[in-house]
Amino acid sequence: TAIARDDPRIAGWAAAVEALELGAGSDDPELRDPARALGPAEGTALDAVSLGEGGTITLRFEPPLADGDGPDLAVFENGFSASFLELGIVEVSSDGVHFVRFDCASLGTAPVGPFGTLDTAQLAGLAGKYEQGYGTPFDLATLRARPEVQVGVLDLDRVMLVRVVDVQGDGSITDSFGHPIYDPHPTAQTAGFDLDAVAALHA
């Protein structure tokens, strides 16, 4: 279920940009500013950082995220409709070295053109599933069985960093089950995932 940008459960927002790697097609100078991903979600098309094809951004949280009851963070994209969606994979880290990726699934079977649409019923665990103003929730508890958690390199009560990775859209990146992930491709100017904000629900 989507998290609205004014949801009372939101305890805070990303505080700093740890790293940014822009991919091809992020050509709008204003939307290359990573500071646009900090603070509260605006829910508008222009207050975002465009990652470009395959681009990544890593954000720091102060205080760190913690595993609470239900979703612990929400990622907001700037999609202008409920079906024209650009997707991202989400990873978390406690130390900035070991990043653990949330499971995701995409059941689309064919490439999507630059103005194509997606069926959200075929998507799970991918940021960008909802239109602007609504964030995709992620629950740290779903990572409890991961080896990185078991050996202590990822502390689910002290998650300092969240990374969003654009899926590129051409099927070259796969979901957790080996299925190709498709979203609108190719696109230009503001290609790839456009990050509005990341919210902390438990910290």
Task: Indicate where each model-derived feature is located.
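A domain-level signal for the mature, folded cores of soluble proteins
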Residues: 1-88, 98-203
